[in-house]
């Protein structure tokens, strides 16, 4: 995957000290930078920075679509566009999308982002380098990641625009309450749980059907190593299992929920985070959170 050649586009490839130490080998992270139209004409100017996270598995090369769109790029180079640096983070991770957060399985992706990658980008491309000038946004997986970054690093970012995020609290993980329900696949009435619905509200697919597909994709014959959605969730939220892989929160074949693993997921449950830390977090988050979700 190559970036479009353009004087306002930069490719960042950084060897992460923290992630490399976790894995015991060289690990690199990537990003694309879209500079503002005035960047060359005002060489002494510093800029605020917007960090964008894509939907599941989205790569940093998505900047190409914007630069190759004449209407967008003509506007971007004009004086009408906001003079802000855009950074497109990369979704690649060891078990699918990295989710840009620290985890027991993928490693310290959150520390890498806030302590290595972002400081490097802001030094290299004249970002203002202050929390007040740093913003984050994304849709779907990116909606979850952007909101999590603002909540878990409240002093580092100054605002989040989160669109249609993944489940942000696990009493409603899709249609499952992982703390109380017994089975991911089957509800209390013995029916298969739907995963998605069509425009008319009718179920299109069950959770079990989707997970059977991920089980086939996984090199361990389970969704844990599929590199798909539930693989990435498991890598992020779960502890490391006895086999060295992320511990599944539910049995890949029967759907039975492991209560101990579900309890470990709590530290990534944003509702729990806010309920337990609201006196401290509330004042820091005032005016910084914007969430947009459809029906």
Stretch-by-stretch model annotation:
Residues 1-295:
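Non-catalytic cap/lid and distal C-terminal segments of serine-dependent acyl enzymes
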């Amino acid at each position: 995957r190559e970036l479009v050649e353009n004087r306002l586009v930069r490719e960042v490839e950084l060897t992460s000290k923290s992630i490399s130490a976790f894995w015991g080998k060289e690990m690199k992270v990537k990003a694309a930078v879209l500079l503002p139209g005035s960047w060359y004409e005002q060489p002494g100017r510093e800029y605020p920075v917007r960090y964008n996270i894509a939907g599941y598995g989205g790569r940093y090369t998505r900047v190409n679509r914007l630069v190759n769109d004449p209407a967008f790029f003509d506007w971007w180079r004009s004086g009408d566009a906001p003079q802000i640096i855009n950074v497109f983070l990369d979704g690649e991770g060891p078990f699918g999308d990295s989710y840009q957060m620290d985890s027991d399985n993928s490693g310290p992706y959150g520390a890498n982002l806030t302590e290595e990658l972002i400081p490097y980008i802001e030094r290299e491309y004249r970002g203002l380098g202050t929390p007040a000038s740093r913003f984050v946004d994304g849709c779907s997986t990116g909606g979850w990641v952007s909101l999590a970054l603002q909540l878990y690093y409240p002093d580092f970012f100054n605002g989040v625009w989160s669109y249609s995020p993944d489940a942000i609290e696990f009493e409603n993980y899709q249609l499952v309450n992982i703390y109380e329900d017994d089975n991911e696949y089957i509800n209390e009435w013995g029916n298969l749980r739907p995963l998605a619905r069509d425009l008319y509200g009718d179920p299109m697919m069950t959770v079990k059907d989707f997970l059977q597909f991920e089980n086939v994709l996984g090199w361990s014959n389970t969704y844990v190593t599929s590199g798909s959605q539930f693989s990435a969730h498991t890598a992020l939220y779960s502890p490391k299992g006895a086999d060295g892989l992320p511990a599944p929160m539910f049995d890949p074949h029967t759907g039975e929920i492991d209560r101990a693993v579900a309890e470990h997921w709590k530290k990534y449950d944003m509702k729990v985070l806010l309920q337990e830390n609201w006196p401290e977090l509330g004042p820091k988050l005032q005016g910084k959170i914007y969430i947009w979700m459809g029906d």
